Amino acid sequence: MAAVNGVGISWPSKLTQGQRPKLVFSPSPRRCTPSSSTIKMTASVDEKKKTFTLQKSEEAFSKAKELMPGGVNSPVRAFKSVGGQPIIIDSVKGSRMRDIDGNEYIDYVGSWGPAIIGHADDEVLAALAETMKKGTSFGAPCLLENTLAEMVISAVPSIEMVRFVNSGTEACMGVLRLARAFTGRPKIIKFEGCYHGHADPFLVKAGSGVATLGLPDSPGGPKAATSDTLTAPYNDISAVESLFEEHKGEVAAIILEPVVGNAGFIQPNLDFLAAIRKITKENDALLIFDEVMTGFRLAYGGAQEYFGITPDLTTLGKIIGGGLPVGAYGGRRDIMEMVAPAGPMYQAGTLSGNPLAMTAGIHTLKRLQGPGTYEYLDKITGELTQGILDAGKKTGHAMCGGYIRGMFGFLFAEGPVNNFSDAKKSDTEKFGRFYRGMLEEGVYFAPSQFEAGFTSLAHTSEDIQKTVAAAEKVLKQI
């Protein structure tokens, strides 16, 4: 355990087999599993197993492949890295999801992060129903934008002004253009395995689906769009210093995931973020935290509150839309005032700030303000992660992993894992077998070893116990 300056809490270092972090949570915290976000559903994980079948999913996916490239609208959903039949989802509620074959799963994907208070929360749905009565999109300002903007600005240390967009990719595209406009410099530094969306400059040595499919980069990205993207291994300060030395006066910004969630779950070494902050200041470059995953998940103020490091600019997404399409970028006022129409840096969007996304975001953030929220996430995620690692040790598998609050990950590798190169040494074939086995046991993890997992306020200790028991059963079988 190592204290984080300015936060007043402890955070677990990378877990390996046999290491058990002290879970730091308030005595008798409020149970953060609201009755409004849970329902009683007959679950395959809660009752004697019926025969597991994906026949309807198989039929639907076969048809989908004739209609959409690969049968999906985002590559990782196709199960390429884990094998087997992709599941077609019919409904979600609380911590559970049900496919069209009637199988139910404890869900640790959470729509890739947004569902931090649980799926289809009753309070959020009720608020959306009221908002929809007034219309779904105005293409003009609405008061809800002010409300959510005030909430984001008050929560995130770096943000003095914010611009809402429609996705995390869009947020990263906008913030990159802004950094170049503000500094007058062309180059950016990103880290190997970090994923900042599918825009051309960010797909150089990217994580997420690019890593899942084993692609070095993506075809179609012209050299003109990628030649100013410099890369370094995550957690490697000397590599960053060398890039600044080689490209003096040319680097506009460093952009990074403060905790990597798209190349496995990789935590920053204790001095890494502080050193990056120091280097950018010394070189008059901007520091950008991509908090699309970590924002409002590691703490109400995101990773920057958790670690006590304040960047110049921040991107957000996922949670701030409560499950609806959304993104945002924000930061220092003097930088943000360059964004049109206040300044010359142009960026626009038809559906940006639409009332539905604003409503869902407002009511999700309100729920996160409740007492004991992040202590509860820390508790259940710690139990889950350590339980899986203990099961791996008990059954003779080399595994490593870690967690922070409501975000976690594990790899079939000895560890430690400090960067993408370390993560790629993991046993992806074994993970595929583990993954398929867990599906049959009614547990849904991300269908790639290189994607972080997420817990929610709707997950219960019973969910965790069932998951750990299922993991031990499957690990024995493989």
From Swiss-Prot:
This enzyme's EC code(s): 5.4.3.8
Subunit comment: Homodimer.
GO CC annotations, alphabetized: chloroplast
Organism encoding this protein: Nicotiana tabacum (Common tobacco)
Any one Gene Ontology BP term: chlorophyll biosynthetic process
Keywords per UniProt: Chlorophyll biosynthesis, Chloroplast, Isomerase, Plastid, Porphyrin biosynthesis, Pyridoxal phosphate, Transit peptide
Protein name, entry field: Glutamate-1-semialdehyde 2,1-aminomutase, chloroplastic
Catalysed reaction, written as an equation: (S)-4-amino-5-oxopentanoate = 5-aminolevulinate
A GO molecular function held by the record: transaminase activity
Names of the cofactor(s): pyridoxal 5'-phosphate
Pathway(s) it belongs to: Porphyrin-containing compound metabolism; protoporphyrin-IX biosynthesis; 5-aminolevulinate from L-glutamyl-tRNA(Glu): step 2/2; Porphyrin-containing compound metabolism; chlorophyll biosynthesis
Residues found modified as N6-(pyridoxal phosphate)lysine: K318
Family as reported in the entry's similarity comment: Belongs to the class-III pyridoxal-phosphate-dependent aminotransferase family. HemL subfamily.
Subcellular location(s) of the protein: Plastid, Chloroplast
HAMAP family linked to this entry: HemL_aminotrans_3
